[in-house]
A protein has these predicted regions:
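N-terminal secretory signal peptides that target proteins for export/translocation
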Residues: 1-2
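Bacterial N-terminal signal peptides
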Residues: 6-16
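Beta-strand-centric surfaces of beta-sandwich/beta-rich domains
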Residues: 21-422
Length: 422
């Protein structure tokens, strides 16, 4: 039986409208809580790539094996590695290249759901690995594998740098990164390794285990904020917050805030009141228009923009927080050169009241590097879940220079029967 599904996407990115400091383990750790840095195009620039145990038959978009899914369960039809370093012996153990990046870069995320064997990681042509140990430990908690940090007590990384099966431990390298997995390909070996590839001239200082001691103050500061951003976040603005309060009638579009620039918003907090709150959060459209553009750089249902949907679902993160009382906060900075307007478009059939505030901050707009924050939404109705009628769902088409910072996806499935795999 087919099942109709609605797919709702909110996509956020910054778009572009000196001389860089060296990239170090410390600078990358500090960047994890530096939302202000997103206002300008990165220098040096980079692209992000991912090495993974995906089914390597899936190499031609729209081809016959595009949706092949033997992605690390073992005994894949096509080996899911970059190359074979050493063929397996009688015990079935071989050595396989799972990541190879030439040029300056940084590992920024690793993940596994299950993997046996060991990993060796080499930097910059060195013959001795900087890491040689458990693959599972490295892909879940890289920093912890290098031993205890002097002067640091407690589970510093758990729930902050390390979250469930993924880890966000920055590991930079100057010239090259090679990672070899030693294991049995007939056994489960799920892995993902996400790497920033910087432009060739980038000045990057290669990671050393001693960095964790050298930058322990940065680690402790970042860990504290990541553990509870809503409570521990520090805003840099010296300006006063500006209140928002409005009641929007059905069918009305109301301008609820206007600011002159150049400035940036460091915080946007809103709370919606309505008889049917779930409907109001979906049917009230948030628009943020910077510098008199003909349409808003931000256009999204208000609840979806903050990641609250459906209804109010509390969570606490650096870019967004949704509190149990319905207060929704965005910490993505929103720079503008001349003006900023916030409009609320009530497309529902009942009045909606919205309260909140913005925190403006000083900002110097640079025509070469400054970027507007953008977030757009789209809905695909009546999708059919079928193993025969599979299809790709392109959700971002962008031109020019910019930095992609995230996507929120909501699936509305009318089928009451739970299915394996979610």
């Amino acid at each position: 039986m087919s099942r109709a599904i609605q797919l709702i996407l909110v996509i956020a990115l910054f778009v572009v409208g000196s001389s860089a400091e060296p990239i170090t383990t410390g600078s990358l750790i500090r960047e994890m809580i530096d939302m202000r840095s997103l206002a300008d195009f990165p220098d040096p620039s980079y692209k992000t790539v991912q090495f993974s145990s995906y089914d390597h038959r899936s190499n031609l978009p729209g081809g016959p094996e595009w949706f092949a899914n033997s992605d690390g369960f073992g005994s894949e039809p096509v080996p899911n590695f970059e190359g074979v370093v050493k063929e397996p012996g009688e015990d079935g153990i071989g050595e396989y290249l799972i990541c190879d990046v030439k040029g300056p870069g940084a590992i920024v995320r690793v993940w596994t759901a299950a993997i046996k064997g060991s990993i060796r990681m080499f930097f910059d042509g060195a013959l001795e690995p900087v890491y040689d140990g458990s693959a599972d430990d490295f892909l879940r908690r890289p920093y912890s594998t290098f031993g205890k940090i002097p002067g640091v007590k407690g589970p510093l990384f758990e729930g902050t740098f390390h979250q469930r099966n993924a880890a966000y431990d920055p590991i930079p390298f100057a010239e090259r990164c090679r990672i070899v997995w030693i294991g049995n390909v007939r056994e489960i070996h799920f892995y993902q390794i996400q790497v920033r590839c910087y432009e060739p001239e980038a000045d990057v200082v290669t990671f050393q285990p001693e960095d964790l001691t050298k930058y322990r103050k940065d680690i402790k500061k970042v860990s504290k904020i990541l553990s509870n951003p809503d409570e521990n976040w520090v805003y840099s603005s010296s300006e006063n917050a500006i209140s928002i309060a409005a009641t929007i009638s059905p069918g009305e579009v109301q301008e609820v805030l206007k600011l002159d620039g150049p400035k940036t918003l460091e915080r946007l907090s809103l709370k919606v009141y309505a008889k049917d709150l779930d409907k109001a959060l979906r049917q009230t459209i948030l628009q943020i228009v910077c510098d008199e553009y003909p349409w808003g750089q931000v256009q999204s249902p208000i609840g979806d923009f903050f990641g609250a949907a459906p209804g109010i679902n509390p969570f606490n993160s650096v870019p967004f927080t949704v509190a149990p009382d319905g207060t929704m906060t965005c910490r993505f900075v929103m720079p503008f050169a001349k003006s900023l307007k916030i409009l609320l478009d009530n497309r529902g059939d009942e009045a909606v009241t919205v309260t909140g505030s913005v925190l403006p901050a000083a900002y110097t707009w640079n025509g070469e590097t400054s970027m507007h924050f953008r977030a757009r939404w789209r809905v695909d109705h009546d999708l059919v879940a079928s193993n025969q009628a599979v299809q790709d769902m392109p959700y971002l088409i962008a031109n020019g220079k910019g930095v992609y910072v995230g996507t929120a996806t909501m699936l509305l499935n009318p089928s009451p029967a739970p299915k394996s795999g979610g």
